[in-house]
Amino acid sequence: MSESPKKVIVGMSGGVDSSVSAWLLQQQGYQVEGLFMKNWEEDDGEEYCTAAADLADAQAVCDKLGIELHTVNFAAEYWDNVFELFLEEYKAGRTPNPDILCNKEIKFKAFLEFAAEDLGADYIATGHYVRRADVNGKSRLLRGLDGNKDQSYFLYTLGHEQIAQSLFPVGELEKPQVRKIAEDLGLVTAKKKDSTGICFIGERKFRDFLGRYLPAQPGKIITVDGDEIGEHQGLMYHTLGQRKGLGIGGTKDGSEDPWYVVDKDVENNVLIVAQGHEHPRLMSVGLIAQQLHWVDREPFTGTLRCTVKTRYRQTDIPCTINALDDDRIEVIFDEPVAAVTPGQSAVFYSGEVCLGGGIIEQRLPLTV
């Protein structure tokens, strides 16, 4: 008697990647069902329409593939475990990455538990562009095959146990192949553009959105030489390396170079700027990271040579990691790096393998 097929619950977002993931798993012989997560209580008509359209697209794809679609509301979990922390970080003058938190707390925790306990799933699956490989009895996280779409940066908090329970079907494909499969199948999501913006907050204007929850506090914009040249509307709206939206022109002492944010003085509510994207004040020789997560869940000790990304889509930076204590490491870059931003994540790699990462606590500036 043959074994019954393993049951997989696919996180259906209403996008093309999760749609094709569901079909690929069907082809591989799994018993597939979909799940649409509602993680935000809409407070305006436009956002409600977007969420409703995504649900309708997810339902249409599931109908086409002949699979059941479940819906679940994780809005309370999202607010408590993602959004409140996100606001706290902004208040402290840092720039958090809520997509990483959302994957940690919602997609690979709340969703994983719900799928296993309430729906009897053997696995969950998502449309992330990553791969998994089992080495010495532990699941490893690998970069997606499509280097342009690789999303391992956003999944570094996952442990080997979570990866072992997760499938990533499109991680073995390139994006154009995924779109072609969707077109050939006649899926409504085939030509739908990729979502941008904060995970579940969607496409709405970020500045307007943040202003609803945190009161803006205008303050001075000063140059690295101490000259006051403008006013900012709130430090939370600015991040290191930012060029647009400063509201100041380009010329000073004959230089036409644009202004960039090089530092934030949170205590005095001052934004510090300099001209040129390679200004020494913007460069760092390394960083201190905390809140570490290693995929193999083994504590890190000693020293390691590897590469690091300090933001998504960045070219890998060769570096040396030194353990400071149980939950802090020092990272020294081989070459100075621009716009290393506290609150963002530093994610480490050995070749194709994502080792883990941590939150950038402070940068080690090239010039003090």
UniProtKB/Swiss-Prot annotation:
Its main location: cytoplasm. One of its GO terms (molecular function) is ATP binding. The keyword Transferase applies. Its EC number is 2.8.1.13. The record marks 128, 344 as: Interaction with tRNA. Keywords: ATP-binding, Cytoplasm, Disulfide bond, Nucleotide-binding, RNA-binding, Transferase, tRNA processing, tRNA-binding. It catalyses: S-sulfanyl-L-cysteinyl-[protein] + uridine(34) in tRNA + AH2 + ATP = 2-thiouridine(34) in tRNA + L-cysteinyl-[protein] + A + AMP + diphosphate + H(+). InterPro entries: MnmA-like, MnmA-like_C, MnmA-like_central, MnmA-like_central_sf, Rossmann-like_a/b/a_fold. ATP binds at residues 11-18, 37, 127. One of its GO terms (cellular component) is cytoplasm. Disulfide bonds join 102-199. It is found in: Cytoplasm. The keyword Oxidoreductase does not apply. Signal peptide: none annotated. One of its GO terms (biological process) is tRNA wobble position uridine thiolation. Residues 149-151, 311-312 are annotated as: Interaction with tRNA. SUPFAM superfamilies: Adenine nucleotide alpha hydrolases-like. It holds the Pfam family tRNA_Me_trans. Interacts with TusE. Catalyzes the 2-thiolation of uridine at the wobble position (U34) of tRNA(Lys), tRNA(Glu) and tRNA(Gln), leading to the formation of s(2)U34, the first step of tRNA-mnm(5)s(2)U34 synthesis. Sulfur is provided by IscS, via a sulfur-relay system. Binds ATP and its substrate tRNAs. Belongs to the MnmA/TRMU family. This is tRNA-specific 2-thiouridylase MnmA. It comes from Salmonella paratyphi B (strain ATCC BAA-1250 / SPB7).
